[in-house]
Amino acid sequence: LGAEAPHKGVRVLAVNPGLIETDRMVTLGEAQAMEKYGDKTRWREMLSNLPEGRAGSVEEVADVVTFLASPRASWVSGTVLTIDAGVTKRAGL
C-alpha cells in the first residue's frame, strides 16, 4: 500500500514506540519491581538496561509523529518507524 498510494497524495506509515513513560507504564513498572524486588521504587533501576537508561517520553514520540505528518516528510512512505532508542537493535530484532 505504501508503494501504491503516494502518487495519490497518500502516505502509509506506522509508528512502533518502545517503552514510553506514561502513568500506566509507571503503575506497571512499580508492580513489576514490587514483584521482583519487594520494593516498587526500584522500577526505575530496571530502566537502566535500556540504551538511554530511561523510558521514552510521550513528547519524543509526538515530535516524530509531528514530523511524519509534516510536508518535510513527504518522501517517507511505506515504512514502520520504531522509536525505542535502539532497544530492538540491541536485542538483535
In which residue ranges do the predicted regions lie?
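Conserved alpha-helical elements of the SDR catalytic core
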Residues: 1-5, 64-65, 69-72
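Short, small/polar-rich loop/turn modules that mediate ligand/substrate recognition or access, typified
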Residues: 6, 11, 76-78
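Conserved SDR Rossmann-fold cofactor-binding beta-strand/turn motif
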Residues: 11-17, 21, 69, 82-84
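Hydrophobic packing within well-folded, soluble alpha/beta domains
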Residues: 15, 61-68, 76-78
